[in-house]
Structure formats: C-alpha cells, structure tokens
C-alpha cells in the first residue's frame, strides 16, 4: 500500500492498480493473492468488485444490486455546481451549516447541498458551471469521489460541464480554466 496525502494506491503484479480513500470506510479484500475494494462494505468479494470479470459481467451484477432509487439517481444530472459555491445567490450552499469562510474548510470541500444530492438523491452525474482554478477543481473532484466511495455500492461521480471550447463561451464557464483551453468556432460546421 502506497499512502499519499488523501488516498492510497495498491499496485499489483499481474493485476489492477487500486486507488482508494482510507476515510471512506471501504475495506480491502484479498483473493488469490490480489487486492479488491469492498465497495458495498459487506465483507464479500462480489462480482462487480472483482476486476477479473468482464465489464459486462460486472455491470450486470451491479445492476441487480441497485434499488429503484439508486437507478433513478444514476439517470439524473445535478443542477449547475460552482466550485466553491457562493454563500448567497443562485449557486449558494453551506459547508457544515455555515459559509465556506466561517467553516474553515478548503475551497475544494464538498458543500452541504452537494453531499445531500449525492447521499440522499443518489446522483452521480454532476454538472460544473464554474471553478476557482484547475487545482481546486481536481481536489474537489477527489473529495467528491472519496465521499461517494463510502456510499451504497461505491459508484463514482461523473463530472461534466457545459461546452467550454467555443470562442463565444461565457466568462463564467471559462473562469477557472486558467486560459489553458482550446477555443473553436461555434458551430464547427461539420
């Protein structure tokens, strides 16, 4: 196990490299000399957790385990998310019940609203509208993944954003890019 600042890696000869967040509650199971993440924390190596099975076999096994509520959550997108969220206004939220500044948490923290839709609504597709910087966005993504790794079946978050590569893209969509994106005419005319 290779410990890093906020996560651990397990490199395996002849097997998959696993990354996990120690604080998520996910345990590591061993079978035939290989390590696997116990994503649903049941102490059993289930088919969907076993990377030796095909993607189709794993997906079928996972689908059988999901409740109707979990399936519905996987079919939905979040509202627009700012990273970090504002303390007032349309994209506002709290952090441990207070503003981000008052909470003392880093700008990459997962907001209360985000925790709620991930935990209670089972959402895993998150639409990002504004980020402070590429570094904060990457750290926030890692924090989101750490949070959901300890929920339900351990399904990760899919992060996406509205189109950002148009020459006429609005400032809020490009605010956190640091100017390091390619700009293309819109529409491309293909």
Model-identified regions with their sequence ranges:
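N-terminal beta-rich core of secreted/periplasmic extracellular enzymes
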Residues: 2-190
């Amino acid at each position: 196990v290779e410990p890093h600042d906020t996560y651990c890696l397990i490199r395996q000869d002849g097997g998959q490299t696993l990354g996990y967040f120690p604080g998520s509650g996910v345990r590591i199971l061993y079978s035939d000399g290989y390590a696997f993440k116990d994503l649903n924390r049941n102490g059993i190596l289930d088919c969907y957790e076993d990377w030796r099975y095909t993607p189709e076999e794993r997906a079928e096994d996972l689908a059988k385990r999901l409740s109707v509520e979990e399936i519905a959550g996987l079919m939905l997108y979040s509202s627009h998310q700012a990273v970090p969220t504002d303390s007032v206004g349309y994209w506002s939220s709290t952090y441990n019940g207070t503003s981000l500044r008052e909470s003392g948490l880093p700008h990459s923290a997962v907001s209360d609203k985000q925790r709620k839709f991930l935990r209670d609504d089972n959402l895993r597709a998150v639409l990002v509208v504004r980020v402070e910087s590429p570094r904060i966005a990457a750290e926030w993504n890692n924090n989101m993944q750490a949070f959901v790794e300890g929920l339900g079946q351990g399904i990760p978050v899919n992060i996406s954003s509205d189109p950002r590569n148009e020459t006429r893209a609005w400032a809020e969509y490009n605010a956190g890019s640091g100017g390091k994106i390619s700009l293309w005419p819109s529409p491309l005319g293909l």
